[in-house]
Amino acid sequence: MSEITHEIDANFAGRLNILRAGVLGANDGIISIAGVVIGVASATNNIWIIFLSGLAAILAGAFSMAGGEYVSVSTQKDTEEAAVAREQLLLDKDMDAAKKSLYAAYLQNGECETSAQLLTNKAFLKNPLKALVEEKYGIEYEEFTNPWHAAASSFIAFVLGSLPPMLSIIIFPSEYRIPATVFIVAISLLVTGYTSAKLGKAPTKTAMIRNLCIGLLTMGVTYLFGQLFSI
C-alpha cells in the first residue's frame, strides 16, 4: 500500500510541476508582450505597427520558450537514460556491487541499517533497476518527460499568456488603449501570481505583489522608452 501511495504522490507532484510550469510560461507571455505593445503604443498610434510588433514578439517569444524547454528536457532525459543504462550495466556485471550500492543509497536517504537491508532485499526480488535509479538519482523509472510535449506546452502557455495584453491593446480606442491594457495586464498578473504561489504552497500575497511590481516596472520602462521615439 505504501508503494502505491508513493507512486500516486509522485505522479501528482509531477502533474503539479507541469501545471506550475505552464502558469509561469503564461506569466512570461503576459509580461513580455505587455512590455512590447505598451512600448510601441507609447511611440505610435498606428494600430498596424502595434499589431505587427506584438505578433512578432509573440512568435519570437513562443518559439524561444519552446526551443529552450526542448533543449532542457532533452538534456535531462539523456542524463536520466544514461543513469539507467549505467545501473543496468552494474546489475549485469556485478549483482553484489549493485546490492551494496542500493543499500548505501537507502542509508544515505535516512533509512536505518535494518530497514535499508530489508528494502534492498525486497527490491532485488521485484525490480532492482527501478529501485537503484529512483533511490540513487531521484529518477522516476520509465517516466521520462517527452521533450516535444514540454516544448508544445511552453509554446501554448506563452501564447495564451500573450493574449490579454495583445487583445486589449488592439480592441480599445487609442485614447484608452494604454491604461486599459495596463489594467488588464495587472489583473492577469495578480491571477498568475496567486495561482503559481498556490501550486508551490508559497505565500500568495507576496507572490501577487512581486508579480505585479515586475509587470508594472516592465511596462513603465518600455512606455518611457517609447516616448523617447514617439512618431
Model-derived segments and spans:
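Cytosol/matrix-facing amphipathic helices and coiled-coil assembly/linker segments
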Residues: 2-14, 73-155
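Interhelical loop and helix-boundary elements at the membrane-water interface
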Residues: 10-26, 88, 142-145, 199-209
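Alpha-helical transmembrane anchor segments
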Residues: 19, 167, 171-231
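Core segments of transmembrane alpha-helices
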Residues: 29-34, 154-165
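Membrane-spanning helices that line or support transport/gating and their immediate boundary helices
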Residues: 62, 66-74, 78, 83, ...
